[in-house]
Swiss-Prot record:
Pfam families, alphabetized: ThiF (PF00899)
Binding site residues for Zn(2+): C224, C227, C301, C306
UniProt-annotated stretches for the region Disordered: 306-337
Organism: Rattus norvegicus (Rat)
Listed SUPFAM superfamilies: Activating enzymes of the ubiquitin-like proteins
Source taxonomy: Eukaryota, Metazoa, Chordata, Craniata, Vertebrata
Binding-site residues for ATP, renumbered to this chain: G81, D102, K125, N148, N182
Short motif UFC1-binding sequence (UFC), span: 388-403
Subunit structure comment from the entry: Homodimer; homodimerization is required for UFM1 activation. Interacts (via UIS motif) with UFM1; binds UFM1 via a trans-binding mechanism in which UFM1 interacts with distinct sites in both subunits of the UBA5 homodimer. Interacts (via C-terminus) with UFC1. Interacts (via UIS motif) with GABARAPL2 and, with lower affinity, with GABARAP and GABARAPL1.
Protein name from the UniProt record: Ubiquitin-like modifier-activating enzyme 5
InterPro entries membership: D-isomer_DH_CS1, ThiF/MoeB/HesA, ThiF_NAD_FAD-bd, Ubiquitin-activating_enz
Amino acid sequence: MAESVERLLQRVEELEQELARERSRRIAGDGHCGRTRIQKMSDEVVDSNPYSRLMALKRMGVVSDYEKIRTYAVAIVGVGGVGSVTAEMLTRCGIGKLLLFDYDKVELANMNRLFFQPYQAGMSKVQAAEHTLRSINPDVLFEVHNYNITTVEHFEHFMNRISNGGLEEGQPVDLVLSCVDNFEARMAINTACNELGQTWMESGVSENAVSGHIQLMVPGESACFACAPPLVVASNIDEKTLKREGVCAASLPTTMGVVAGILVQNVLKFLLKFGTVSFYLGYNAMQDFFPTMFMKPNPQCDDKNCRKQQEEYKKRAPAQPTQETAPQEEEEVVHEDNEWGIELVSEVSEEELKNSSGPVPTLPEGITVAYTVPKKREDSVSEVTVEDSGESLEDLMARMKKM
């Protein structure tokens, strides 16, 4: 019995050593990816450079400094259909650090969502995602948290990590992405970001899986999630009471991919400062419709921190430098009905026009003719008229057939 226990303890020690070696290999970048960590991005066009196509954006003038992407940290809450694909795209883009939050496990029912694989069923989503993402790009730093952010004991830790979990410990993350599938979690993220003044982006897919949206939330500047909440939130309805037994929401990998794509595109434009960042961008798969809009914050928002952020933004706005534009001199309008100064030139001279005109009638003073009747040409051919014979069309046709 003692020997069996000793063998088991020895085996446990061997496994712990193997686990430590595996962790060391992952940190060093010698894991499953087959390459070491790249210290600096290069634009060298070779097959062995994973960043050559990304750095081409700089060479083509789209982005001024693509290397800056490695200095940013992004937190993703919800590693499901949209969140996992979002994390994969940012990993492939070479983001500096990703913080992943989710409490769910991978199920076979998730296999239609593009990212997870069948052998990962039963694993926590954050662990499965980290394992796959680290093998894709070992240059990215990962921090995973397997818990529900809406619970009291975990909400404070969630706030601590987004305010101190940046690329450098103690610095806030640069952006928080909401990829959750319920309003309770969205409200928790909204509350945390309003309190911290943290910019975040929200995303979602409709229950029938044929539409979705993304929304940028800048505390104080744009509407937060509580400024114009959905009916289920405004009515304080428990979401659990709305779900029927045996009925689940639809899920299309195409819609998930589109929403994740436009979300990451907006993230890249926001971080790397190129193009126009959308405050709201919708997607309707039925009509291929992409509506955009900007929503102002609600001065009577239920979230007190949102109202506080609005007041602080109003104080900051006058101090922000405004882009001065040189005054443009307005060109004098030649004629109110002809602002372009277009002139119509006749191909006929005044003398020719006078000679070809007919007699001008005598008119009272102040009245002129718009045009004159042209003279009848003397060499014009007179019209030839034929007298009506009185025969019908049928008779004429019969006579023609006899000829």
